[in-house]
Amino acid sequence: CQVFDGNSQVKMVNEARAIKYAADNGAVILQCSWGYNSAYSNPLQGYVPGPATDEEWSKTYPLEKEALDYFIHNAGSPNGVIEGGLAIFASGNEYSYMSSYPAAYEGCLSVASIAADYTPSSFSNYGMEVDFCAPGGDSEYHCVPGEDTDGNNVNIDQGMILSTLVVEGKAAYGYNEGTSMACPHVSGVAALGLSYALQQRRHFKVQEFINLMKQTAREVDSYYKGYKTYYYLH
């Protein structure tokens, strides 16, 4: 269900209705490339820090938490491929050591972004709340100086993700970066896994399926060593 209007705004009541509608009509995966700023995002960079704890988030956005809890606990079916719902959120792009909410909520899955070399993207939020990471691009790491056809120095962006964009008010495709691009990779893997499980007549409790995803994910910690060179000039 689309909950945002053309101005990237959403009313909380519409969001809650859409989430409940999804659960009641057979959806078992929420793909959510949105969220608030991390509680530890830097105000000096123009960010307004968001909630820092589950309690603070639930008090500030009680209807949102109620809707997500409804989906997590009521989506799916005891007689279907999965009992419960997967609420998958982008971790945020403030380069903060904590995911933003709702991604940081213990009932949701938080997705951080990695570059093509499996190291964290320069913008991605990270921390103990993150459950998965996936390709989200990193133009700062892959930006290569060059010249255009007129001999002007330009930056040629590489390593970004082909994504949906809004161009002049219309839906289009283009290259972008962010945890919003990483998150759909995990949602897609979850959907593929559930599709195969259905063919095999398997049934999972939601936590069983989450555990299976984590057990079969690729380890990336071994890539986190040495130095990472950036080519982008601020």
Where are these regions (language model features)?
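Bimodal feature
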Residues: 1, 20, 24-27, 33, ...
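Acidic glycine-/aspartate-rich tracts in secreted/extracellular proteins
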Residues: 4, 35, 93-95, 115-117, ...
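Short, solvent-exposed loop/turn elements at domain surfaces
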Residues: 8-12, 119-121, 140-143, 221-223
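Non-transmembrane alpha-helical segments in soluble domains
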Residues: 19-20, 72, 88, 112, ...
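C-terminal subdomain of the subtilisin-like protease fold in secreted/lumenal serine endopeptidases
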Residues: 20, 27-34, 42, 83-85, ...
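Alpha-helix termini
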Residues: 68-83, 137-145, 197-202
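Extracellular S/T/G-rich loop segment that most often corresponds to the catalytic His/Ser-adjacent loop
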Residues: 100-195
